[in-house]
Amino acid sequence: VPDAAAHAVGAGLDLPEGVPLFLFVGRLMWYKGLRIILDAMKLLKDGGYDFRMVFVGKGTDGDEIKAYAKELSLGDKVFFAAPAYDRDVVRAWYCRADLFLFPSTFDTNGLVVREAAACGLASVLIAGSCAAEDITDGKNGFFIEENAASMAALLKKLYGKRALLRQVGENAQKEIYISWESSVRRACARYEVVLENFRRGLYPPHDAPSDEFYRHVSEYLAAVNRARSGLLELRGDVQKGCAQLTEKLDDLWDRFL
């Protein structure tokens, strides 16, 4: 991505040249570890560090996350950009940033980490998380513990070390990023292994369900439906009884009170 395009993507935001830019791309959901990011940014700001943090995306927790950033007085450091659906725009964000922050333990395999690596951008990840698979700490990415203090400590340690960040990002590009061509080749190779094992009889045959099995399933479903019908009938009787009781109470109220 040309430098002009990378800088144009942040137009309208206060992103000074030379100031470290941290990036998150994805859905704005608390379970992705975004509270860790915001709390870490607060620690950096309180420590006198100058930086910028940009969230690119949207989500059902977006309003709460923005409100929390405001509560932490991070309005001059943290910005929320609109979700990017154009690949060139997403790529420009990756090329514009200095570090990609992804402290999620929810994601099984962070595709955004691969996207960042494709653009030569190193990621900060939770040690032991699924997203950290294939990452070697300090070589093609960085690990932290699952808390804001750990993230802030790492970012302080890396502050101003742009040459190191570029080198780790280049390593990520070489070692983590997998092109579609490579992915297809890997998938085909695995399918060939499966087919060959099948031809050699290495997979035990699976018996098809018997008629008796289906009969038991049918009886079970019939019993469930009968129980459901009984519960619905009972609910109707209870509602009818409650209505009658309410009517009698109202009558007593009118007579004696």
Predicted regions and their residues:
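A conserved mid-protein helix/loop that constitutes part of the nucleotide-sugar donor-binding site
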Residues: 20-43, 49, 53, 60-66
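Short alpha-helical donor nucleotide-sugar binding micro-motif in glycosyltransferases
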Residues: 83, 91-97
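Nucleotide-activated donor-binding/catalytic signature segment of Leloir-type glycosyltransferases, i.e.
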Residues: 66-84
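Aromatic "clamp/platform" in nucleotide-sugar-dependent glycosyltransferases that forms part
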Residues: 105
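Short hydrophobic beta-strand element within catalytic cores of glycosyltransferases
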Residues: 122-126
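A short, well-ordered alpha-helix in the C-terminal region of glycosyltransferases
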Residues: 164-178
